[in-house]
């Protein structure tokens, strides 16, 4: 219980740091909805949570608060010392550095597109670092949920763009020991975390939950990872939970960060079809409708509508190019990338201001022209021009029609054609794409 309280205090002060910023009034209105989640332990009941309000009232936790704050300040001090000790060569790199944020939702091809930047040796690429934040910090349902969570996600991304990987320690459970961790989500999907000095020799007793793919590395040393980030010319982050563009304005206006944002979208009918396969239990209501005729309840349909509306609102804001976003936002359709991967990769690189390397082109060719596509739903090896519309043969028209009804505004903005019958849906010779040029000069 003592350790649990320590974890709670640490996260509470992370949120306290956010409250100090511009959004102080917003966060204060939702503090009663804030929930902290902790990993299961023998002495902790599953699904147990502690609210931020109860933490402030629990005087027994005050004794731990000083130690918790000191831990956070110590991490910041460690990062600051690394920056101060950076060589003149590293400082030159930082001066011309570009920062890229790839925003997407699940099953939109973001892992595949993210590899376009992961394969560039000049880029420090992080694969979904907010996964740990999302699993640790949640909010009770309510109108302010998206606001509060977006602010926390944004602030973590801001620190990561500045190569402050110690920030992640506040959301890792079990906690990192001397900046060593074996549980960073999908570490193997970030080349920068599995190469050079970051790939330390494995030691006995050190187990990686998400090991590197091609090399046998020891536990991830966040100090070495931070140093590697500072030495790379550019930083790119692929993230899923951060979806509301308007909350990124402080990040865009941060003079230390030269940020470009790419929003990746996909036909919502295809997204639902893919999620039904990848997450069968979560989308069981839709599968039952497809197989047994049981109509999903309004809540399930409402989730689809809400997702589409969030995507539309973000894209509309980005395309409108307000002064703070001028030349900093690009909307890309997954389907366009699947059809012309090299061309679209070149567009994204040109937009980001980062040179595209031969290694990236080689990877794209080898992973989009493979002789046989992988059956692994998480694979990035695809015959992309053949795979992107495969969903049309498996999704029942009655489900596609519901998605069209609730997502029509977003589909029209993104240029996805509606279908009127099952025959048209299954006819892959009839394109569902309208010509769109979202390139912003």
Curated annotation (Swiss-Prot):
First-tier enzyme category under EC: transferase
Expressing tissues: In electric organ, it is moderately expressed in spinal cord and electric lobe and undetectable in non-neural tissues. Expressed in a punctate distribution in the innervated portion of electrocytes. In the CNS, it is localized within the somas of motor neurons and neurons of the electromotor nucleus.
Residues that carry a glycan: 47, 58, 221, 427
Annotated source species: Tetronarce californica (Pacific electric ray)
Single GO term (MF): chondroitin 6-sulfotransferase activity
Enzyme Commission number: 2.8.2.17, 2.8.2.21
Identification of the protein by name: Carbohydrate sulfotransferase 3
Phylogenetic classification of the source organism: Eukaryota, Metazoa, Chordata, Craniata, Vertebrata
GO CC annotations, alphabetized: Golgi membrane
Gene that produces this protein: CHST3
């Amino acid at each position: 219980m003592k350790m649990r309280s320590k974890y709670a205090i640490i996260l509470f002060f992370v949120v306290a740091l956010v409250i100090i910023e511009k959004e102080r009034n917003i966060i204060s209105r939702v503090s009663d909805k804030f929930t902290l989640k902790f990993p299961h332990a023998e002495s902790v009941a599953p699904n147990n949570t502690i609210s931020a309000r109860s933490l402030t009232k629990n005087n027994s936790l005050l004794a731990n608060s000083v130690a918790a704050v000191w831990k956070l300040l110590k991490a910041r001090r460690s990062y600051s010392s690394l920056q101060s000790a950076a060589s003149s060569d590293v400082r030159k790199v930082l001066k011309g550095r570009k920062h890229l944020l790839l925003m997407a939702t699940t099953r939109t091809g973001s892992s595949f597109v993210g590899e376009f930047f992961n394969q560039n040796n000049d880029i420090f690429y992080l694969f979904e670092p907010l996964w740990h934040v999302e699993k640790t910090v949640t909010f009770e349902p309510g109108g302010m949920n998206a606001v509060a969570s977006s602010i926390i996600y944004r602030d973590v991304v801001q620190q990561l763009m500045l190569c402050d990987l110690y920030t992640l320690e506040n959301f890792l459970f079990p906690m990192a020991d001397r900046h060593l961790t074996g549980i960073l989500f999908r570490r193997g999907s970030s080349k920068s975390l599995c190469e050079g000095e970051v790939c330390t020799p494995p030691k006995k007793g050190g187990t990686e939950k998400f090991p590197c793919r091609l090399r046998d590395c020891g536990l991830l040393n966040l100090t070495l990872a931070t140093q590697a980030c500072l030495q790379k010319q550019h930083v790119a982050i692929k993230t899923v939970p951060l979806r509301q563009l308007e909350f990124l304005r402080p990040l865009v206006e941060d003079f230390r960060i030269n940020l470009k944002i790419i929003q990746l979208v996909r036909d919502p009918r295809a997204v639902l079809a893919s999620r039904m396969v990848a997450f069968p239990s979560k989308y069981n209501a839709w599968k039952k409708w497809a197989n047994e005729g049981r109509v999903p309840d309004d809540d399930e349909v409402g989730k689809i509508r809400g997702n589409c509306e969030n995507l539309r609102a973000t894209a509309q804001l980005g395309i409108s190019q307000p002064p703070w976003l001028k030349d900093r936002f690009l909307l890309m359709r997954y389907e366009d990338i699947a059809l012309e991967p090299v061309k679209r990769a070149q567009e994204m690189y040109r937009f980001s201001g980062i040179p595209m390397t031969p290694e990236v082109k080689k990877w794209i060719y080898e992973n989009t022209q493979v002789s046989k596509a992988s059956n692994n739903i998480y694979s990035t090896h695809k015959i992309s021009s053949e795979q992107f519309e495969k969903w049309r043969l498996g999704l029942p028209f009655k489900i596609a029609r519901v998605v069209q009804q609730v997502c029509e505004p977003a589909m029209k903005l993104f240029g996805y054609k509606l279908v009127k019958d099952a025959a048209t849906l299954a006819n892959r010779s009839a394109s569902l794409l309208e010509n769109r040029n979202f390139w912003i000069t």
